[in-house]
């Protein structure tokens, strides 16, 4: 046991599967030691609750030079303490360097020794040492302009250095101040006022098992073109043996219906319907205790005040998905406005929810349905079956009456009577019946008794049927056939009568 704990960590516990229980239970001293041991190790988050991704890039080697090619983005991505350090260090070095250049010019011209001579014109007036040169640079760079130190026209090198100082100072100011401004106005801070519920829930909604979580906007300013996406991160192994530690699957949160486009004025509940296309098709309350997955939620939109794109992220592990729960309502109608109570934003309550997966529910629904004969959905198969029945009728009508009774044609009405009387057989469709019965049953006003009586007459001895029992059209055809028979010669009429006798 100690070896297992060293391997899997302190989160390891011995669990057993029980056929009558609801899931996995810790193994007690009185239980069977032969039962299966399933180590349960806590999953390492890929995305924290605050949206930070737990990814560290290592062993880059020579690829680190790519960061210098995009120096501005590199500085913006640094933490604030490093930004402030670089900001102060850059200005300090630039000031000391330029002050040293002014001191070097004064030293090479001999202004430091001749500054107090009455008729001598120095390069920079009143610069006697390095501190005075540093103060002159600060007055020039910051455009303070006290007027006590100034450049004279007897120093061309000072004029060139002054131009270089102005250009370099403008570049440094634009780079560092721009970097600080971009970092302060980053839309990451806008994401701090976008809330996600602490837990996701699974319960029934509109008769379907649904995964739900809640999002909210704390500010009065809106998120323009807000869109939400969900990713399922789960490790799996391909049939070829390749192991994928972070396989990403898309969760449908309303792409086809447009429900992923949010009007985020008040808290909204995001829904993912679990169906045959969902990765959670096999997920049940019991299997959640052994599954390991992470649901990453990404909310994107444009900040109304700045026009910059903002993205907020969070994630839910299998331990943060509550089965059989529902969110408390947070919106109430007040006098002339709607009030949102954020104290109930994360609150949930239990609701009756089947503990089975959608796949298991569909299988149980099929098992509980009455046994029905397989319907012939193919038109070709239905046509062939009708032809077989017609051929069987032709064969039996040619037999003598005694053989017709032996073939069991009298038993057909009883079977049809049982089919029409039992309630469990009401699932039969008209496509499962012969074409003759379909035409009879499709006539309005034909009840089950009439259908059985007509079926009995149709399946009885055809020689006993009279013309009066036939429909009007068939009666006309039969009458026309009789008239045609009367017009035949005597020899043909005799042959026709001999054929039927």
Swiss-Prot record:
Q: Where is this region: Polyphosphoinositide (PIP2)-binding?
A: 182-209
Keywords, in A-Z order: Glycoprotein, Ion channel, Ion transport, Membrane, Phosphoprotein, Potassium, Potassium transport, Transmembrane, Transmembrane helix, Transport, Voltage-gated channel
* Gene Ontology BP terms: membrane repolarization during atrial cardiac muscle cell action potential; potassium ion import across plasma membrane; potassium ion transmembrane transport; potassium ion transport; regulation of heart rate by cardiac conduction; regulation of monoatomic ion transmembrane transport; response to electrical stimulus; ventricular cardiac muscle cell membrane repolarization
Intramembrane spans in this record?
130-141, 142-148
Q: Where is this motif: Selectivity filter?
A: 143-148
- Where is this gene product found? Membrane
One CC-aspect GO term: presynaptic membrane
Q: Which residues carry this modification: Phosphoserine?
A: 385, 424
Q: Where are the transmembrane segments?
A: 81-105, 158-179
Instruction: List the membrane topology term(s).
Output: Multi-pass membrane protein
Residue stretches of biased makeup (Low complexity): 18-38
Q: Which residues lie on this side of the membrane: Cytoplasmic?
A: 1-80, 180-501
Q: Which residues are glycosylated?
A: 119
Region (Disordered) location: 1-40
Q: Which domain of life is it from?
A: Eukaryota
What is the activity-regulation note? Heteromultimer composed of KCNJ3/GIRK1 and KCNJ5/GIRK4 is activated by phosphatidylinositol 4,5 biphosphate (PtdIns(4,5)P2).
* Gene Ontology MF annotations: G-protein activated inward rectifier potassium channel activity; phosphatidylinositol-4,5-bisphosphate binding; voltage-gated monoatomic ion channel activity involved in regulation of presynaptic membrane potential; voltage-gated potassium channel activity involved in atrial cardiac muscle cell action potential repolarization; voltage-gated potassium channel activity involved in ventricular cardiac muscle cell action potential repolarization
Role in the control of polyamine-mediated channel gating and in the blocking by intracellular magnesium (site feature) positions:
173
The entry assigns this protein to a family as follows: Belongs to the inward rectifier-type potassium channel (TC 1.A.2.1) family. KCNJ3 subfamily.
The job of this chain, per UniProt, is described as: Inward rectifier potassium channels are characterized by a greater tendency to allow potassium to flow into the cell rather than out of it. Their voltage dependence is regulated by the concentration of extracellular potassium; as external potassium is raised, the voltage range of the channel opening shifts to more positive voltages. The inward rectification is mainly due to the blockage of outward current by internal magnesium. This potassium channel is controlled by G proteins. This receptor plays a crucial role in regulating the heartbeat.
Q: How does it assemble?
A: Associates with KCNJ5/GIRK4 or KCNJ6/GIRK2 to form a G-protein activated heteromultimer pore-forming unit. The resulting inward current is much larger. Associates with KCNJ9/GIRK3 to form a G-protein activated heteromultimer pore-forming unit.
Q: What name goes with this protein?
A: G protein-activated inward rectifier potassium channel 1
Protein species of origin: Homo sapiens (Human)
Organism classification, top ranks? Eukaryota, Metazoa, Chordata, Craniata, Vertebrata
């Amino acid at each position: 046991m100690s070896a297992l704990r060293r391997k899997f960590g302190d989160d390891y516990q011995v669990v057993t599967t029980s056929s009558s229980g609801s899931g996995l239970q810790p193994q007690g001293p009185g239980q069977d030691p032969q039962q299966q041991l399933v180590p349960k190790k806590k999953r390492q988050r890929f995305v924290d609750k605050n949206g930070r991704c737990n990814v560290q890039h290592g062993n880059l080697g020579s690829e680190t030079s790519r960061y210098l090619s995009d120096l501005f983005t590199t500085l913006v991505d640094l933490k604030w303490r490093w930004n402030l350090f670089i900001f102060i260090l850059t200005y300090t070095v630039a000031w000391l360097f330029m002050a040293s250049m002014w001191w070097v010019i004064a030293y090479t011209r001999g202004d430091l020794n001749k500054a107090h001579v009455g008729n001598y014109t120095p390069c920079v007036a009143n610069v006697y040492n390095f501190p005075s040169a540093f103060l002159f640079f600060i007055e020039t760079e910051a455009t303070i302009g006290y007027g006590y130190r100034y450049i004279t026209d007897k120093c061309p090198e000072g004029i060139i250095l002054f131009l270089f100082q102005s250009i370099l100072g403008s570049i440094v100011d634009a780079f560092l101040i721009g970097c600080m401004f971009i970092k302060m106005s980053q839309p990451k801070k806008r994401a701090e006022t976008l809330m996600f519920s602490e837990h996701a829930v699974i319960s029934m909604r509109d008769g379907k098992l649904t995964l739900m979580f809640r999002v909210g906007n704390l500010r009065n300013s809106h998120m323009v073109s807000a869109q939400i996406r969900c990713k399922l991160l789960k490790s799996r192994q391909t049939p070829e043996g390749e192991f994928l530690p972070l396989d990403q699957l898309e969760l449908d949160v309303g792409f086809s219906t447009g429900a992923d486009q949010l009007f985020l004025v008040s808290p909204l509940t995001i829904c993912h319907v679990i169906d045959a296309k969902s990765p959670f098709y096999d997920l049940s309350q019991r299997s959640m205790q052994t599954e390991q997955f992470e649901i990453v939620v990404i909310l994107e939109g444009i900040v109304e005040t700045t026009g910059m794109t903002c993205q907020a992220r969070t994630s839910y592990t299998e331990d943060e998905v509550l089965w059989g729960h529902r969110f408390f309502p947070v919106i109430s109608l007040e006098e002339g406005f709607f009030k949102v109570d954020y104290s109930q934003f994360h609150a949930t309550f239990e609701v009756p929810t089947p503990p089975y997966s959608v796949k298991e529910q569909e299988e149980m629904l099929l098992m509980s349905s009455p046994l029905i004969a397989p319907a012939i959905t193919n038109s070709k198969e239905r046509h062939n079956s009708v032809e077989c029945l017609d051929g069987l009728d032709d064969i039996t009508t040619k037999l003598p009456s005694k053989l017709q009774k032996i073939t069991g044609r009298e038993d057909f009405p009883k079977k049809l009577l049982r089919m029409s009387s039992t309630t469990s057989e009401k699932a039969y469709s008209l496509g499962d019946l012969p074409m003759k019965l379909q035409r009879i049953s499709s006539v309005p006003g034909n009840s089950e008794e009439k259908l059985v009586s007509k079926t009995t007459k149709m399946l009885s001895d055809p020689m006993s049927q009279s013309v009066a029992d036939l429909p009007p059209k068939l009666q006309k055809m039969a009458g026309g056939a009789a008239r045609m028979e009367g017009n035949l010669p005597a020899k043909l009429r005799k042959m026709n009568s001999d054929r039927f006798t």
